[in-house]
Design a protein with these regions (language model features):
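Active-site cavity-forming subdomains of large catalytic enzyme subunits
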Residues: 100, 104, 114-120, 167, ...
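Short acidic, glycine/serine/threonine-rich loops at helix termini
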Residues: 96-100, 124-129, 167, 194-200
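Glycine/aspartate-rich loop-and-adjacent alpha/beta segment that forms the canonical ThDP
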Residues: 175-232
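Short beta-alpha connecting loops at secondary-structure transitions
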Residues: 119-127, 150-158, 203-212
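Structured core elements
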Residues: 87, 113-115, 156, 184-186
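Conserved thiamine diphosphate
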Residues: 62, 76-80, 133-171, 215-232
Length: 232
C-alpha cells in the first residue's frame, strides 16, 4: 500500500488490496473532464463483485446518448460513445452477481464488454464441475442477441492467438460502441505459468499432459513470438 495520494489516489494506502483506480475530481473537488481521459473504476476483492457496478457505468453511457437534458455535460460523455470494459475469471462466472448483471445488460441494451479469462480451472477445480456444459459461452447461448430481440453478443477466441484477439476485440468493441448491444468475450485456453497463485503448485492438480500442453501453448510465449513475427 502506498500512502502517497499521487501514486494511490483512491484510498492513500487504506485499501490494502491496492486496486487501481482513477480520479473523478481534482484536488479542489472540481469534476474532471472524464470524457477526455481513460477511467478506471476500482476493482473489489469479493469474486464477481465488479459485475453490478458495470451495469451502472454502462447504463450511464446509454442515458447520456438518449437524454437531451444530459447533452450539456459534454465533459462527462461524448454522446454516450463510451464502452464499459469488465474482466472476470471463468470460475467467478458461477457467482450470482455475474448472472444478474449479464441478464440486466441484455435487457437494458447497454455498452458493456465483459471479458471472461478461462484457464479451465477455478483455483484447482476443473470448470466442468462448476459450469454448465463446461463452458460459460455455451451456457449463455440462450441470451444470444437475435433479430427483433434483446440479448447479448457472444464471442469465442483463444488466449494464445493474439492476431485473432486483436481482430475480434476491435470489431466487437466497435459494434458495442455503435449499437449499445452488450457482449461477452469468452477467452479460452488461457495459461498460468505458476497456477492460481504462488501459495501452492498447480502440479498437484494438473496432469503431466496438461502441464506439457501449457508449456507448449503458453500465452506469454506466443505473444512474444507474435510481436517478433509482426515486427512490433
Amino acid at each position: 500500500a502506498d500512502t502517497n495520494l499521487e501514486n494511490e489516489p483512491f484510498s492513500g494506502g487504506r485499501q490494502m488490496s491496492n486496486h487501481f483506480t482513477s480520479d473523478n475530481f481534482d484536488d479542489h473537488g472540481n469534476p474532471l473532464a472524464l470524457a477526455h481521459q481513460k477511467n478506471i473504476s476500482t476493482d473489489m476483492a469479493p469474486t464477481a463483485a465488479q459485475m453490478p457496478r458495470t451495469i451502472g457505468l454502462a447504463l450511464a453511457s446509454k442515458l447520456f446518448r438518449n437524454s437531451e437534458a444530459l447533452k450539456q455535460f459534454a465533459d462527462l460523455s461524448t454522446n454516450g460513445d463510451e464502452v464499459c470494459f469488465c474482466t472476470i475469471g471463468d470460475a467467478s462466472t458461477s457467482e450470482g452477481h455475474f448472472w444478474e448483471a449479464i441478464n440486466a445488460a441484455g435487457v437494458l441494451q447497454i455498452p458493456l464488454a465483459v471479458f471472461v479469462w478461462d484457464d479451465g480451472y477455478g483455483i484447482s477445480v476443473p470448470k466442468e464441475y462448476q459450469t454448465t456444459k463446461g463452458s460459460i459461452s455455451a451456457a449463455l447461448r440462450g441470451m444470444q442477441k437475435r433479430p427483433d430481440t434483446n440479448g447479448i453478443d457472444i464471442y469465442n477466441v483463444k488466449g494464445w492467438n493474439y492476431a485473432e484477439l486483436c481482430e475480434v476485440f476491435e470489431a466487437g468493441i466497435e459494434k458495442i460502441r455503435r449499437t449499445h448491444i452488450p457482449a461477452v468475450f469468452h477467452v479460452e485456453e488461457i495459461t498460468q505459468p505458476q497456477g492460481h497463485s504462488t501459495s501452492g503448485s498447480h502440479e498437484r492438480y494438473k496432469s503431466p499432459e496438461r502441464l506439457e500442453w501449457e508449456r507448449e501453448w503458453d500465452c506469454i510465449k506466443h505473444m512474444r513470438n507474435w510481436l517478433i513475427e509482426s515486427s512490433i
